[in-house]
Design a protein with these regions (language model features):
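PRPP-associated nucleotide enzymes
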Residues: 1-187
Length: 187
């Protein structure tokens, strides 16, 4: 890989299995002589009151750190991502990129009735406050969520892979549904 900063890939607990598959696929694409990509070592200390503290067991100083974590429920998955981003920044990572296959609270993208929060905007604020430099996510509930960030957001659409795959199955009477009007355009 020709870049100034080494790349390190880490996974939070909810995404360890998925991250191992990502690393295997990345290594298939890696040009000869570039060296193998590995999943970085990290650990999570759980305290007696249930609080947890992620930490890196190897140096990330000067590295571009990718942290892979889906933020599906429970909320601890989001909190672990936030703490891991913070730990990377405090360990002098050059940049921290959050890879979020599932962006939790994305369905709360607007104020659709009085006295409700806009959860997606709050999550964006929390990620930025933790120190993330870039977000990579897949199939956001609504495109406008990208505008909640003041950092780059790479919004990846699974349809580029999913639609050709579904067509290859030659299924009859196939129906695709969406949970609400926000997802109807994608369906």
């Amino acid at each position: 890989m020709n870049c100034q900063h080494k790349m390190e890939l880490f996974a939070c607990r909810a995404s360890k299995d998925f991250a191992a598959k990502v690393v295997a696929e990345l290594n298939k694409l890696q040009p000869e002589g570039e060296g193998e990509i590995h999943l970085g070592d990290s650990e999570v200390t759980v305290f007696s009151d249930g609080e947890f503290q992620p930490s890196f067991t190897e140096s990330v100083r000067g590295a571009t750190v990718f942290v892979l974590q889906s933020t599906f429920p429970p909320a601890e998955n989001l909190m672990e991502l936030l703490l891991t981003i913070d730990a990377a920044k405090r360990a002098s990572a050059y940049k921290v990129i959050a890879v979020m296959p599932y962006f939790g609270w994305a369905r709360q993208d607007r104020k659709d009735k009085p006295r409700v929060s806009i959860g997606a905007k709050l999550v964006a604020n929390l990620l930025c406050a933790a120190g993330v430099d870039r977000i990579m996510t897949c199939d956001l509930h609504a495109d406008q969520i990208q505008g909640f960030f003041d950092i780059p957001v790479d919004h990846i659409y699974a349809s580029k892979v999913f639609i050709p795959y579904l067509k290859s199955l030659n299924l009859e009477n196939m129906a695709i549904a969406a949970p609400d009007m926000g997802g109807a355009k994608r369906a």
